């Protein structure tokens, strides 16, 4: 028993310094990587730092993360509310990126539903939800672009005659009207509406015709 305790004690006595050195090496490596990242970020902001202590690295990192958190909060607030301060090009780009990803995901869901043997009530509800949310995103993006355009017009001289920066997207009322037609959901698989992704920054809007009867037809939105 004494021999076993002695071996355990000796093992801990030897391993503890080794583990401590490994832990310190990991900390130092992370601090070095963090220093390189912070120096690069500061240089992008116009600040030049030649030497940083470990405490300085941690302080700068905390400040930088707080700034990122505030910016992210403002962007999220603009996405959710869609009102308040004029949206920046960054927040508008975030909304556009999310909308494009949503359209792509909705297209994949549509393809799966179209491949099913029959269209049930659940499928129609899913398609209705997707189209309603897509129209909301489209309206939200248009509102933010209008606010951004008004804000830019106030910031530049009236004699310039054009905006300093082009707006993202390029969507107009016609696209919103085309999106609204997407909410007209019917009762058969052939009448389910396909949502496709956007090509570039513009949403192509076209109307296609589908019918259950030989003489009946109604427009649906197929943006490809």
Curated annotation (Swiss-Prot):
Residue intervals of the Orange domain: 98-130
Position of sequence motif WRPW motif: 221-224
Domain of life: Eukaryota
Biased segments, Polar residues type: 205-215
Variant or mutagenesis effect after changing residue 83 to F: In strain: NVIII-m11
Pfam family for this entry, one: HLH
Annotated spans, Disordered: 205-224
Function: Transcriptional repressor of genes that require a bHLH protein for their transcription. May serve as a transcriptional regulator of the Achaete-scute complex (AS-C) genes. Belongs to notch signaling pathway and depends on Su(H) for transcriptional activation.
Annotated protein name in UniProt: Enhancer of split m3 protein
Organism of derivation: Drosophila melanogaster (Fruit fly)
């Amino acid at each position: 028993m004494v021999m076993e305790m002695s071996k355990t004690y000796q093992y801990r006595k030897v391993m503890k310094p080794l583990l401590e050195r490994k832990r310190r090496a990991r900390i130092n490596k992370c601090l070095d990587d963090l220093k390189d990242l912070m120096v690069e970020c500061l240089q992008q902001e116009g600040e030049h730092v030649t030497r940083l202590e470990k405490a300085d690295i941690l302080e700068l990192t905390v400040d930088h993360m707080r700034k990122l958190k505030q910016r992210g909060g403002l962007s999220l607030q603009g996405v959710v509310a869609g009102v308040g301060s004029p949206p920046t090009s960054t927040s508008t780009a975030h909304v556009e990126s999310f909308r494009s990803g949503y359209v792509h995901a909705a297209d994949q869901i549509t393809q799966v539903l179209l491949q099913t043997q029959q269209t049930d009530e659940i499928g129609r509800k899913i398609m209705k939800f997707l189209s309603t949310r897509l129209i909301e995103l489209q309206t939200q993006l248009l509102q933010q672009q209008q606010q951004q355009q008004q804000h830019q017009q106030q910031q530049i001289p009236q004699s310039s005659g054009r905006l300093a920066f082009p707006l993202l997207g390029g969507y107009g009322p016609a696209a919103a009207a085309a999106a609204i037609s997407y909410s007209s959901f019917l009762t058969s698989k052939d009448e389910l509406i396909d949502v496709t992704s956007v090509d570039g920054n513009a949403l192509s809007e076209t109307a296609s015709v589908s019918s259950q009867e030989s003489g009946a037809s109604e427009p649906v939105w197929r943006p490809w």
